[in-house]
């Protein structure tokens, strides 16, 4: 391992990317580089023009991201997990979901076994050994606060010195009542009137604002008024008149207030109601101290502001890693402030239609791109030219910038030639391919693209490589890492492929026993996708734009699964999301194994991903290209099928189940008994039977397996017992 470390140190020093701890190179020590890690939520490879060159794709304008790519290396075959939590846990631990238990987006009902374990060696814990200070700003979604002993303090427990942002999986739902002022049944029965949580259009009107004493006051800007979005962006709530329309005069706003009072409604808007990206719960954790407040700042702007403030506070301190985990473009789709957009005057008519959502998706990315440019300038890494363009010269900095999407794009805004029916939440190419860009001092031949396979778990090793840390030494040997190197691609433009395969998987998380999940159908451009693993409530299904079929859902209500929805013949064509799936691919072929609903198709799928200029230019795994249904495989395909199947089975078998081991050391001993006692009566990672409570049953599981060493191979372990 010393040889590996010296080699890694040499690479780091040659690139100017950091310092090493090996004694033979200490006299050459340089300040370790800072790491700025930018995560775009639900931005797949189809969204950025640097990765999707299809003439059919109307991609957003992203000059800031394009500038980073022009000064760095783009990775065109970067593979994530199909959903956010599994991807995020993978890149912060370097471990596949079947090892961490986080195989699906964490929902409020998921038990601790489906959340990141406090015993994982996360990258902030590893970097701390080299003196790094770590912060995360923005979306968290690794575990908690529900059903987690650490609650809102989870980021601190997982190693981050500072956290500020939205700890949940996405922004809150849109407030279609405009602060409780509008009720569709009372005012015209139009539930879509404020589908974006704000009056749209150029109309200027009255804005409710809170004074320092939190008393609502009407603000008309001396007669100039505000557009609905301007009011919302300022932290206010647009005032409605007596007809439930945007009030264009102070008299109209006063009449609306009086009319609501006569109807038994509150005459003033409710400033406690959350509203998508504009009004949300901000959680801050610093040195284990929790603070929470209701933020009324557009989320992407707030995330950038907090990031710049934190970076500036590190001046003169040691090396740092900042994860800027933007919440865009997670649903709900909502128009950003106009001053963040390059297309003045172009506005979506609503936030529910397919065309409108595609426009909103582009605008949310464009707004985020502008804020990424402001982030680089605020961090001292770039300057704004007179023409507004970004001038970024990473060679003069000591900061490596890594930008990724966390998984594929969500259904409504997928761009051609990628497949919306096989997007986020599925194991198919559109669901697991995302952009990745790395820029920093010493990158060889910037502006190039690497086509070789890179996995999301490899980021863990890249973070270590930048800091001069061998993560395989830093993590306990009994905890298997799946990471492989990335740094050689940055140093050497002619680097041979490092990975031969990438592995992806998705499951249903871990809900309390006996819990049922209502089926939800997501419809888009004639495609209908049914899932009974993603949305734990009918309201969550509705908030995502779906149709629920639970006890109070769409008629016929009470359907007990997607097969029942299919049997009801409600849709001409219904795709059912598998209950769980894994996939493995090499440079050309891809094998998928599904746990399907009883009414669905065969468990195995096999694809040739070689791109064809006309029928499959992106090399996708579309239904018509599935090989096993086309007859016997040819010799080359059969050989690859066998190799991929054997590799996947060996990989899955490498993680040995260890009942009674709660602290991830592959031993069942006194520390596990202590864990049961410390968490007795509540949920925890020591709840081995996943019934939602740590109790006598879990103690008995530890006692039954006491002193078992799960690292010993099966037959030998059986002999020992």
Kindly give the residue locations of the regions a language model identified.
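C-terminal cap/loop subdomain of S1 sulfatases and analogous C-terminal strand-loop tails that border
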Residues: 159-162, 166-174, 184-189, 409-415, ...
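Short, structured active-site-proximal loop/turn typified by the sulfatase FGly-forming signature C/S-X-P-X-R
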Residues: 53-88, 133-135, 158-167
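Active-site-proximal N-terminal segment of extracellular/periplasmic enzymes that hydrolyze or transfer
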Residues: 27-73, 140
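Formylglycine-dependent
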Residues: 103-104, 110-121, 129, 141-317, ...
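Alpha-helical segments with a strong preference for the paired helices of cellulosomal dockerin domains
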Residues: 662-683, 691-719
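Active-site His/acidic residue clusters
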Residues: 45, 307-360, 410-419, 609-612, ...
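A long, amphipathic alpha-helix that forms part
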Residues: 301-312, 344-399, 660
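Histidine-centered active-site microenvironments of extracellular/periplasmic hydrolases
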Residues: 147-159, 332-335, 377-446, 454-455
